[in-house]
From Swiss-Prot:
Known pathway: Cell wall biogenesis; peptidoglycan biosynthesis
Protein name: Phospho-N-acetylmuramoyl-pentapeptide-transferase
GO BP terms in the entry: cell division; cell wall organization; peptidoglycan biosynthetic process; regulation of cell shape
NCBIfam families per the UniProt record, alphabetical: mraY (TIGR00445)
Species of origin: Buchnera aphidicola subsp. Baizongia pistaciae (strain Bp)
Cofactor(s) needed: Mg(2+)
MF (Gene Ontology): metal ion binding; phospho-N-acetylmuramoyl-pentapeptide-transferase activity; UDP-N-acetylmuramoyl-L-alanyl-D-glutamyl-meso-2,6-diaminopimelyl-D-alanyl-D-alanine:undecaprenyl-phosphate transferase activity
Length: 340
């Protein structure tokens, strides 16, 4: 398992590092470049000619590494790949519409939400009614030794919001160079450790968590995500040479969501993915506050734009958000000790 984890990590990492420059050149050649909102921070206009849709290579690297190093007879592998590819296609359509029509709107919110929801519902149906693994009707509560049993309808609803919510939250967070990809690495690292423990009878008993037989292979997929994300960061760090686009943010967010669902760690995801939660809540609060008072609470949302407009340098803001995400990852790992 550990050897396959390492090999999966390096396979996806090397694919990103080898093909990244070629993809950047190709995207520049065909003018597949970031569309900047006219009402956004002025500093973002410098990013106008930066190529986008780098998420295509992230998805490709994860798929290749997964096919090579996982056991393809495992149903959890295919459920995860379905979300990765399906959400990637939705993001691809969204990105293409932005580039074709030369605006930052892309798919309408209704169409995007509907497509994401349909695929999420299909996957959830397969999990709860076709595979019907006994662990799917259990819910792990972080920092508590209690496990809630026989809550199928609640679990289904939580699973839906975990997949949809995470995909959109990552999409909202992906607004600055490297801002989203590092928290993705931290969250996935946390999930990889939990999946390794959950897939081992002795370790799951020792840490007082649910034993999930199929979860072993999720560890290998997590390794592929971490490797491809690190490889992407090589080109995405400030000043970015490439952006992942919606094809990357929606697919990675959805994949993190489905992995947390399969591990019964949706509530923990709220903690370790707290940065994504903060970004999303800032948008929701802004909308509600404006509807009630007709005034803006923040200068601009997601909240990282608010700090930008307040004069915080982009690099300082990004690193501070990374620090927050790292602390949240450690907090998630602390849960394992509390569960004992």
């Amino acid at each position: 398992m550990i050897i396959r984890f390492i090999l999966s990590f390096f396979t996806s990492l090397l694919l990103m590092l080898i093909f990244g420059p070629h993809l950047i050149n190709w995207l520049n050649k065909y003018k597949i470049q970031q569309i900047i909102r006219n009402f956004g921070p002025k500093s973002h206009f410098n990013k106008k000619n930066t190529p986008t849709m780098g998420g295509i290579l992230i998805i490709f690297s994860i798929i290749i590494s997964t096919i090579i190093w996982t056991k393809l007879s495992n149903p959890y592998v295919w459920l995860t790949l379905t979300i990765l590819i399906g959400y990637g296609i939705i993001g691809f359509i969204d990105d293409n519409m932005k580039i074709y029509y030369k605006n930052s709107k892309g798919l309408s919110s209704l169409h995007k939400f509907s497509l994401l929801s349909i695929l999420a519902c299909i996957i959830i149906f397969l999990i709860y009614y076709i595979i019907n693994d006994h662990s799917t009707i259990k819910l792990i509560v972080p920092f508590s030794k209690n496990i809630i049993f026989n809550t199928k309808m609640i679990c289904i609803l939580i699973s839906y919001f975990a997949i949809i919510g995470t995909s959109n939250a990552v999409n909202l967070t992906d607004g600055l160079d490297g801002l989203a990809i590092v928290p993705i690495i931290f969250v996935t690292t946390n999930l990889s450790i939990i999946s390794f423990i959950s897939g081992n009878v002795n370790l799951s008993y020792y840490f007082n968590t649910i034993y999930i037989p199929y979860s072993n292979e999720l560890t290998i997929i997590c390794a592929a995500i971490i490797g491809s994300s690190l490889g992407f960061l090589w080109f995405n760090t400030y000043p970015a040479q490439i952006f992942m686009g919606d094809v990357g943010s929606l697919s990675l967010g959805g994949t993190i969501g489905i992995i947390s669902v399969l591990l019964r760690q949706e509530i923990l995801l709220i903690i370790v993915g707290g940065l994504f939660v903060i970004e999303t809540l800032s948008v929701i609060i802004q909308v509600l506050y404006y509807k009630i008072t007709k005034k803006k609470l923040f200068k601009m949302t997601p909240i990282h734009h608010h700090y930008e407009l307040n004069g915080c340098p982009e690099t300082r803001l990004i690193i501070r958000f990374w620090i927050i995400s790292f602390i949240l990852m450690l907090l998630g790992l602390l849960m394992l000790k509390v569960h004992q």
